[in-house]
Amino acid sequence: MYKTLCGTQLLLAIFVLFLNFSHATAKGTRGPMEIFKKNFMEKNKLNDVYDIFKFLYNKFSHDTYLSNIKNQSFTMNTWGFGEIEVVKTKCRKIDSDFYKCSFQWEFCNIKRTPGVTIYYITLPGSVRCRKLLSKLVNCPFEEQTEQLKREICYFQLYPDYIEQNIRSVRFNCYTK
């Protein structure tokens, strides 16, 4: 009986040590888990920014509809200050000879507000569908699409921005 009791106590002591070791390991991994969670949230924020951009582009552009642009097809930078170069054209996006349009160059200096981020999104030359085709997927008829050169858009969400209220936003695109 003495051997059984010692064996049981030994097993119990090993079990308690194992529990303590597991708890210490859990404490040690908690920091990296929080960092991972933070990175995950940032990735979700980028997706949210992309969705907002797509919505704003479709709402404020006059003749075209942005469709089927995947996350990999644009780059985004966040800048807090500096001058923004805005390019205007006399041609409408619907014009067939878009590449030969003459551009007017303007410089726009936007006053920065603390806590306001401006998102710059560069779209490579890609196909846009006309808005009347917005319910159709993939712009099915080639003659109803247009190929644009690289386009740079920026938008600014103000601190009082609420998800469903897109009134406090500044949005602009230009083509290079």
Swiss-Prot record:
Q: What CDD domains does this protein map onto?
A: CY (cd00042)
Disulphide bonds annotated for this chain are: 129-139, 153-173
Query: Gene Ontology cellular component?
Result: cytoplasm; extracellular space; vesicle
Q: Per its record, what triggers expression of this gene product?
A: By androgens.
Query: How would you summarize where this protein is expressed among tissues?
Result: Prostate.
Q: Which UniProt keywords apply?
A: Disulfide bond, Glycoprotein, Protease inhibitor, Signal, Thiol protease inhibitor
Question: Which residue ranges make up the pro-region?
Answer: 27-30
Which N-terminal residues, if any, form the signal peptide? 1-26
Residue positions with a glycan: 71
For this protein, the record's InterPro entries field holds: Cystatin_dom (IPR000010), Cystatin_sf (IPR046350)
Q: Give the source's domain of life in one word.
A: Eukaryota
The protein's GO terms of the molecular function aspect are: cysteine-type endopeptidase inhibitor activity
Q: Which PANTHER family does UniProt cross-reference here? A: CYSTATIN, CYSTATIN 10
Q: Which family does it belong to?
A: Belongs to the cystatin family.
In its UniProt entry, what is this protein called? Cystatin-related protein 2
Q: Which gene encodes it?
A: Crp2
